[in-house]
A protein has these predicted regions:
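Positively charged, polar, low-complexity stretches
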Residues: 2-106
């Protein structure tokens, strides 16, 4: 019988709750429109995650993707975790490798 290897980045329920509380007050840093998830959008998200660790994104009405689809597509391409999806908005978290910022303590 094979053991399932857990994802080292997987967040606990307590960590998700803490990140949701922090993300509540954020304004969307990334807007996803008609072009969906492009390389330029991924690069912008990478930069925002490195600078802030926790970002909020919004899917505009013209997009062909739902917020859940966009969240998972962007999280996969940026190696981030989806914290929460509500309506047209979602939050992503990834620990930053930068040492010059205040890291979120989980």
């Amino acid at each position: 019988m094979q053991q399932k290897v857990s994802d080292p980045m997987a967040l606990t329920t307590t960590q998700v709750r803490q990140l949701r509380a922090l993300a509540h007050h954020l304004n969307p840093a990334i807007l996803i429109g008609k072009a969906d998830v492009t390389d330029a959008l991924v690069k912008q998200a990478e930069q925002a995650l490195e600078a802030h660790e926790l970002i909020k994104c919004a899917v505009q009405d013209g997009s062909d993707l739902s917020a859940r689809e966009a969240a998972h597509a962007l999280a996969e391409r940026t190696n981030a975790e989806v914290v929460q999806v509500i309506g047209h908005r979602f939050s992503l978290y990834r620990e930053s490798s930068r040492e010059d910022i205040d890291h979120i303590k989980l």
